[in-house]
Amino acid sequence: MKLRWRFGLAAALFLAVFSLYPQMKLWYERGAEWQGNYAYNDIDEVAYASYVKALIDGRPRKNDPYTGRDNSPETPQKESLFSIQFAAPYTLAIPARVLGIPATWMMTIGGALAAA
């Protein structure tokens, strides 16, 4: 049985580009006034982007994007919905920190990669 990788790669590329449509439409509609915003598909992505930004900024894994509190010896934080899902946020945060990419761009890029 011969695998047809080209079809799979073409489908992945199509889905990645298609997932960028909301962001491209935002850029088109707002033009130079887009102010660094990004289009999101789910209501919890705002808090998730805040958590990723905190990791990019070097804050600890156990931080709360809703209250802004960080884990410290004086105020230890419990595990949260965000801190237990550390693989995906760090997959976005580490390259962003190294390359100097803002969280809004990483959320857009991450969405395209997830769609592919």
Indicate where each model-derived feature is located.
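N-terminal membrane topogenic signal
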Residues: M1-A11
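Active-site lumenal/periplasmic loops and adjacent helix-entry segments of GT-C-fold
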Residues: V17-A116
